[in-house]
Amino acid sequence: FEELKKYKSFTKEANNKFILSLGAGRCGQNWFAKIFNSHPNWIGTCERFSDFEAFFRYISFYNLPINKDGFFELFQLACNRDLAKYQNTIIASPYFAYGVEELFKKLDPNYLVFNLRNPVKSVESFYRKGWYLDFETEMNKNKKSPMINISNNLTRALSRIVPSEEFFNEWLSLTRIGKITWFWANTNKFIFDDFNKIKDVNKYFIKLEDINENYDFYKEMSIKFSFEKSISKKEFYNIINKAPNKGPLDKYEYKNWNNIEKKEFHSMIDKIFPYYDNIKTNI
């Protein structure tokens, strides 16, 4: 933080570009940021201050009366540093989802990117990561206030939110697939709603299945964002091959889900976020 404070007086110029990347998680944001980070005139980061970001998700989702100015200052300073040293920056995080409009007003990015991944692959990935595993259903019935879902680190404990108020007990009765699908659908809906409210900024939808291993897409990005020293197709694929953090559990694919899990999955999507198929990658 002391290093960042050196850039407090920095002023963004016309040739500085700042992208804010939003997503529900498991949607390729880390890889997307690495594409930018592969060029000398850009720096790309994802989950840069993960504990603070997870706390931001927690207090934003539960609408807790906690002043967020310190969080906004941290990211403004980080952005200033990036722009001063590298000219352009993309800051990505799945933890920004419940405060998009607020972040936009405070940080003033030049571009907003909404990273998405199809719901089946997303839920499979969250499941493999251990989301809502060993959740104490009986202990948590009828709770009226936000809880901490204890995990092996603070970031996960704060970020694995659960619904509050009247839907909570119904959510507890769902399978893990149902619980995870609620999270995916609800988080994307929050981003989608704020994304559509925001005007006078360049906004892009990016679907992972449209851009994954797509070098033509990279070439379009290279032009749009003025990448210096474009990378080769082989270098581009090497970025993809370094995707981290797949999760400790075995795969549990849609074809193996039982009928209850599939019913809950489709019900949650139809009820909360039925827009995915109609969204088009527009970069």
Set out the residue ranges of the language-model regions.
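Glycine-rich phosphate-binding loop used to anchor ATP phosphates in small-molecule kinases
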Residues: 82-102
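PAPS-dependent sulfotransferases, especially Golgi type II membrane carbohydrate sulfotransferases
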Residues: 1-15, 154-205, 210-283
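Acidic/polar short surface loop at catalytic or gating sites that assists cofactor/ion binding
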Residues: 129-173
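PAPS-dependent sulfotransferase catalytic core
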Residues: 1-84, 132, 243, 247-248
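Short catalytic/ligand-binding loop motif for oxyanion handling, primarily in non-cytosolic enzymes
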Residues: 29-33, 51-54, 97-100, 120-125, ...
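Short His-Asn-centered micro-motif
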Residues: 22-24, 90-95, 115-117, 207-209
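Conserved phosphate-donor/acceptor-positioning beta-strand/loop module used by diverse small-molecule
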Residues: 106-127
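PAPS/PAP-binding and catalytic site of the sulfotransferase fold
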Residues: 28-42, 103, 107, 127, ...
